[in-house]
Amino acid sequence: MRVGIYYRHSFHQAIVQSTSRALQPQHDCLATSDTGELTRYRPHVIVAAEDLTYLHLRAHLPLSRFVHTRHGLANKGIPARSFRAADYVCVTSEAVRDDFLAQGIRPRRGYWITGYVQMDNLFSAPRPPQIPAGKKVVLYAPTWHDGLSSLPLLGSRVVDLLHAGRSDTFVVIKPHPLVQQGKDPKLAPWMQTLRAAARDRSDTYLIENRGEDVMPWLNAADVLVSDASSVQLEYLALDRPLVLIDNPEHVTSPHYDPNGMEWKWRDMGQRIGTADALPGAVSAALSNPRLGAERRAVYRERLFGNLLDGRSGERLARRVDQLAPEVASDAQLLAVSPIGHAVHTSLPYLRNASRAFKRLLRSA
């Protein structure tokens, strides 16, 4: 079969790398971020981390089977839309599948219990060379959504707060790739603040590479500081302490999802609501790595079960193998390809028209 592996952003490549390796021996694979190239390829199956609704991929390829790996484990209100657009959705455990079913969230054809493919290298990832020996590593990995991110709370004091007044710490700051990109005028000042705070600090490393795989940094961290990011759920696998910062405006954010594990399981770490509480929480976590371990163990089992063996990509590939009897024929894919080409050609114009109409409404 032809299998298209779609990544919208460069940082999605790390999510699908183990899946790509597992698929290539058995299938003709194309990994691309170009929807036009994907459409011309006419894949029988598409594996994508991205929410398919953003890009109208089904309109491009109406007969292809869509497999959604997710690009993070936090909900943020996305599964109700993105899961229903996919034929199959990969989840990390039976318990997680059952939670979504209880909420009435169903893919078109079913869930695949594979584990989370991005985490396949979590336990094997080497320690990044930027981290000096003998230091306790504090990893700060905030989300990017306005109202959820802790970046505005910490501001220019971010580095000093994370060091918690200790001399034995090395702080690593891993902004979300969309913050790193800096094109959004709402997000650009956050990156500028981080650069200024980390400048000339030998005890602090700011990750600037948008495509950087976060797994080696998670594996190296002694404590994770976050807010409502997916990394806090991935970090549960390592059984190390977390500090979670609540933005006071989180309940007003359109991405606040009280049904998401990022909020239902808030006691997975120390929960704080002010910047001034951060140093004490970080120091407590570093002094007692077993802090909160009992709750973390409960959530880790529910989230991952026994699927932390680094073989999630292989399990996904085996499920793709089994799709052969149900995929469209080459003749069928060829017959509908003019539809895909027409959609790909016209979509930019439709988007521009939609934006112009919205601007007109706002100015009226």
State what each model feature region is.
Residues 1, 23-31, 166-171, 202-204:
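A generic structural motif
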Residues 4-124:
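Active-site and donor-binding regions of nucleotide-sugar-utilizing enzymes
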Residues 4-7, 12-23, 119-193, 272, ...:
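Conserved catalytic-core segment of nucleotide-activated headgroup transferases in glycan assembly
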Residues 47, 67-68, 88-90, 112, ...:
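Hydrophobic/aromatic beta-strand patches that form the interior of the parallel beta-sheet core
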Residues 62-68, 211-254:
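A donor-sugar binding/catalytic signature common to diverse glycosyltransferases
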Residues 108, 230-304:
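Catalytic binding pocket for nucleotide-activated donors in carbohydrate/polymer assembly enzymes
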Residues 187-210:
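Nucleotide-activated donor-binding/catalytic signature segment of Leloir-type glycosyltransferases, i.e.
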Residues 275-364:
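C-terminal amphipathic helix plus adjacent low-complexity
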